[in-house]
Amino acid sequence: MPHPRHGLDAAFQTPLRLSLMAALGREEIDFGALREALETSDSQLSKAITALEHAGYVAVRKGHLGSRPRTWVAATLRGRKALERHLAALAEISRGYLDS
């Protein structure tokens, strides 16, 4: 049986990307709300979103709210499944530590 670390997804190896996916859940969230919730800069959040978008894990929608441009981000089904696998691998790795 392979070690559970092989189930970790490289797309989630930065704390911000992992936090971003967890924050999204099944909702579409405004960029500004994500920035505030994750306590990060526009630049760092934009980079994290771009990386996850390239992996197919998030979808980005741009539009306007009134006359103001807005960006919304949502986890894709592929992204939610990848996060579930990643978290399961982390839990399995942690179980080994907690059981000792």
Please state what every model-predicted region is.
Residues M1-R5, A22, K81-S100:
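Amphipathic alpha-helical dimerization/coiled-coil segments
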Residues P4-Q44, L65-G66, R70-W72:
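N-terminal helix-turn-helix DNA-binding core of bacterial DNA-binding proteins
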Residues A33-R35, S46, W72-V73, H86-L90, ...:
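Surface-exposed beta-strand edges and their flanking turn/coil or helix-capping segments
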Residues I49-E53:
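Short, hydrophobic-biased segments on the C-terminal half of alpha helices
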Residues G56:
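Glycine-centered, phosphate/nucleic-acid-interacting loop/turn motifs that mediate DNA/RNA or nucleotide
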Residues V60:
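Short beta-strand "wing" residues that participate in macromolecule-binding interfaces
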Residues L65-H86:
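Basic, amphipathic "hinge/linker" alpha-helix immediately C-terminal to the N-terminal HTH DNA-binding motif
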